[in-house]
Structure formats: C-alpha cells, structure tokens
Amino acid sequence: MNSDLSINPAIHPEEMKPFRDSYWVIPGRFLAGAYPGLDNMLTTRKRLTKFLQTGIDRYYNLTGEHELVPYDEILAEEANLLQMPVIHHRFSIVDRGLPSKMLMFELLNSIDAALDNNHKVYVHCWGGIGRTGTTVGCYLVRHGMSGEQALDKLAAMYATAGQSRFHPRSPETREQMDFILNWNES
C-alpha cells in the first residue's frame, strides 16, 4: 500500500487543484473535495476537463444514486475526447451519515489499489465535508496515523479548500469524527 502522506515542498499543490473546493491528501495523486458537477452542463464539462487535465482518472462518488445530477456520462465523454480511460465508482453513504465498516474497508481498498497502480484519485460527496472527510480520516489512520493525528492532518488539509471558509471543520458531525477516532480494520 502506498503510504507517502508527506508534502513535497517542490510541488505547489494549490496551483494544481482543478477547483477551489478541494484539497490534496497526497499532492498530485489523491484529491478530495466537493461534488465536481454543476446544474449547468457547459460549466460541468469545463470543470471535469480541468480534473482530467490534472490527470485524475479514478472518481469515488460517495453520494446516493439520485442525490445529485449525475456527471459520469459527461466525464466519460470528456475523457474520451482526451483519449483518457477513467473509472467512476459509487460508494453511497447517507448525507451526514456513516458507512458500514465493510463499506469503508472496501472503499479504502479500492483507493489504495488505484494509487498502487499509479492512478490519480478524486474522492467526493456533495460538499466535500462530512462523508469525504470521514473517508480521508480513515485513510490516514489506515496509513499509520492515530485517530487524533488523522483529525489534525485532515483539519490542515481541509483548511486549504474553499468551502472551509463557510464550514470550518471536516468531517461534519461528532459521529463522523468518532468513526475516524475508532477506525481499525481488525
């Protein structure tokens, strides 16, 4: 499993982000944040093209199937124009809720497999705060941090995202924070 969670000072990740409501978990490789689509199809296409130009080819959507306007077909069309294979995964977690332990385990395994195979990953929910933060926190614990360290690291990474100005902490609920603090895979 890839556990390079350090930030390379030669990389300026903020300049590489495809949009402001996101943050790097592993600079240049693992991005997390808000829903990448918008109600306007043209703007969604432009935004998704920025993601693709960043090299992100694995998308982990934590929203429910009918929760937001789907973007996976537009993503596939734009990726096809760039001759870039992409995969859109859906791991549905209820808004402000918690996944089952098994779902989180499967999600983390899929993210690790993508990173181990040199893919670039984007994990998102609607706002990029609760479900996304819970996933990132558990990822950090999986890769050697304590729950407290993971929450501290998550706070520092999330502070670089645009939405942190309006919602200052990730994850969103006390239950989501406790899920990270208590995460283990035994």
Identify the function of each model-found stretch:
Residues 1-122, 127, 134-186:
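Cys-dependent protein tyrosine phosphatase-like superfamily
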